[in-house]
């Protein structure tokens, strides 16, 4: 009996451990300005995840190349990675960005082409980037997003997210990215009423200019929203990558946001 119980626990533990891990990171101005050393640091930080969603890829020359450099560096870590990059968003010229996804091909399969939101691309300045993946026999679609800055009132565009689950009723949506807005804001209430929950509550994710009294994080901007009826959170966390640097100024050469992640199972 004890052996049976032990085997069951081992199998359950192995099953949970093998579930997909998704990380989201706003990597500030990911483009030609990032050195090979900085790209290598990013790869070392991200290599243990299965899907990477990136915001703030430079729209012009150097952005797509930086993602390719990151994929190349990840491929040196022992697993095979692939990637896809969005077209520039339809925002004003100086606000245009790209999004990117990278994924371990042994863990998940990309289904079809990734695409930028079409219906609300005028209402949302940097319209979100969708990509459908399959893990075992179940599919889910990650919706990668970078909102306008806080002083420009990101809630004025996040409010359109309440229409997306119905618009894509055949998809299991996971919203990730930099919302420049805390999950407690009432703009998220319609999504919550539809069964969506945030992975993080009260977790600050942007870097201060300087640490004060040991506190280095400024605002609760980045998050992940999942449909609680179809997805179960197994584990989650943030990566305090800045602790590897002597100062926040040095750390900010990588990014002014920290990566956020969660591991999940599909019901």
Walk through the language-model features, giving the residues of each.
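Structural recognition of the beta-strand scaffold that forms the well-ordered cores
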Residues: 21-24, 50-56, 84-85, 100-101, ...
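Extracytoplasmic, non-cytosolic globular domains
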Residues: 129, 133-200
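Solvent-exposed loop/turn segments at secondary-structure junctions
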Residues: 27-32, 57-61, 88-93, 106-109, ...
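N-terminal, active-site-proximal structural segment of metallo-dependent hydrolase catalytic domains
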Residues: 2, 16-99, 155, 159, ...
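Metal-dependent phosphoester-hydrolase catalytic domains
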Residues: 60, 166-172, 181-267
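Sec-dependent signal peptide recognition
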Residues: 2-9
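Beta-strand-turn-beta hairpins that frame and shape the catalytic cleft
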Residues: 18-22, 106-109, 123-145, 267
């Amino acid at each position: 009996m004890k052996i049976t119980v032990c085997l069951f626990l081992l199998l359950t533990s192995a099953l949970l451990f093998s579930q997909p891990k998704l990380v989201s990171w706003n990597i500030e101005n990911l483009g030609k300005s990032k050195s090979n050393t900085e790209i290598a640091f990013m790869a070392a930080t991200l290599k243990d995840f299965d899907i990477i969603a990136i915001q703030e890829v430079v729209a012009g020359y150097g952005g797509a190349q930086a993602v390719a450099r990151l994929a190349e560096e990840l491929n040196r870590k022992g697993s095979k990675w692939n990637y896809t990059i969005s077209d520039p968003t339809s925002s004003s010229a100086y606000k245009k960005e790209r999004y990117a996804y990278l994924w371990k091909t042994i863990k998940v399969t990309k289904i079809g082409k990734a695409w930028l939101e079409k219906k609300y691309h005028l209402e949302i300045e940097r319209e979100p980037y969708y990509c459908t993946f399959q893990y075992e026999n179940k599919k889910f679609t990650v919706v990668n997003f970078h909102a306008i800055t806080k002083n420009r009132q990101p809630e004025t565009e996040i409010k359109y997210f309440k229409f997306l689950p119905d618009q894509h009723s055949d998809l299991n949506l996971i919203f990730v990215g930099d919302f420049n807005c805390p999950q407690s804001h009432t703009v998220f209430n319609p999504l919550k009423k539809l069964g969506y929950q945030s992975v993080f509550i009260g977790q600050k994710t942007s870097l201060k200019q300087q640490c004060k009294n040991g506190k280095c994080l400024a605002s609760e901007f980045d998050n992940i929203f999942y449909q609680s009826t179809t997805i179960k959170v197994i584990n989650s966390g943030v990566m305090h990558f800045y602790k590897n640097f002597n100062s926040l100024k040095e750390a900010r050469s990588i990014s002014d946001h920290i990566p956020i992640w969660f591991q999940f199972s599909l019901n």
